[in-house]
Amino acid sequence: MSKQFVRSAKNLVKGYSSTQVLVRNATSNDNHQVSKDSLIELAEKSYDSADFFEIMDMLDKRLNDKGKYWRHIAKALTVIDYLIRFGSENCVLWCRENLYIIKTLKEFRHEDDEGIDQGQIVRVKAKELTALLSDDERLNEERNMNIKGRNRKGRRRRGTGRSDENDDDLQRAISASRLTAEEDERRRKQDEDYETALQLSKEEEELKRLQDLQRMQQQQGQQQLQQPMYYDIFGNPITPEEYAQFQLQQQQQQQQQQLQQQPMYYDVFGNPITPEELAQFQQQQQLQEQQYLASMQQQQQAMSNNPFAKSEQSSSSPKRNQLVAASSPQQLQQQKQQEPLIQNRTGNQSMTDKYSKLNELLATGTGIDTFGNVGEARIPAQHTKTGTFINSQGTGYRQVSDDPNHNPFLNSQYTGLPSTSVVPTQTGYGFGNQSQQQSQNNGSNNRGYTLIDL
């Protein structure tokens, strides 16, 4: 009673007409079904243009109501279904023009507090109305049949009063509509289940393909981060194996160029040696030369006062292996053949320069020396400058006689040398390293030698 009172008060406050109030009561938000009297009255009022617009305006508001007022929507669809069957032709035209509103209700859903989907009845009624409005032949046939039945019922109503409450035709039509709606709903569920399963299968397949693609992209990205990209001279990407092969070829070419530019070294036997061995040998050779030069300086200092000592600079020098840098053993042999022979000097250069004139006279002249020798038998004068005879081999060295009585020829010999007696200097290993006692013995033994003894 409270809801009816509130609805009545709202009708008065908003100034609804009797036709609008009739539509509001027929589509109220309660559990009661729409009364048949209200449907018949609304169908009759639909033939009036003013009432028609009021009826359709209120039904349009009910169809666009909120989801929690699902009873308003369901009852409004029931009223529209009755009007297109038993109402005026304008009701059919209005429904066809606003068919999109009815089609949207085919997807209507609403769950109550208990989790029950109350939008099922709305979806069934909307689908049935859409099918009926789309089939003109069926709609015209039902309208003609219902109009004839309504006329018969009108005549019976005038004769029998209110005997049309249990109209069998209306009950059969409602039952047929319900069966059709249930069958369509069952078929739609099956189609929806199949479509849902197919859609899920497609989505799973697409998701799997996307995951595989992402995994491949991640692996490629990791490989690119771990391995740098290499390019050839034309900017084309190459694999690391090709780049390593290219680097190896470059290294081999560089090594070949270095070998071609670097000279080959050979020993005296023509065997190739490495630059390290050459450097080591040169270092050893330099050390040997330094040692040899040091020893030669000592010998020259000791031999500076001995005009008869032979210079052993070239004769006593050690033979050293020579290394030749050449590109081939043939060039080494040619260099050996082209090397000129080095003339080794013997004797003291200063003495040779000093007595060069005398040597020339003695070698080319035809005179006789102090001993009467002629030709090659002549003895150079420098061997007798001390006043005591010394032959060309140095025998009789240190023959200095205090008593010249044994040889009367020595005191009278004069070969152009100064008369000042020359004291011999002990040089060389053979003379300078002898002990003093041995030297005195040699002097006493050699004293008194004559030309005949020598």
Curated annotation (Swiss-Prot):
Biological processes, Gene Ontology terms: actin cortical patch assembly; actin filament organization; endocytosis
Biased composition (Polar residues): 303-329, 340-350, 384-398, 418-428
GO terms under cellular component: cellular bud neck; cellular bud tip; clathrin vesicle coat; cytoplasm; early endosome; endosome; mating projection tip; plasma membrane
Region of interest: Clathrin-binding: 447-454
Name of a matching Pfam family: ENTH
Membrane topology: Peripheral membrane protein
Bias type Basic residues, positions: 149-160
Glycyl lysine isopeptide (Lys-Gly) (interchain with G-Cter in ubiquitin) crosslink site(s): K357
Similarity section: Belongs to the epsin family.
Protein name per Swiss-Prot or TrEMBL: Epsin-1
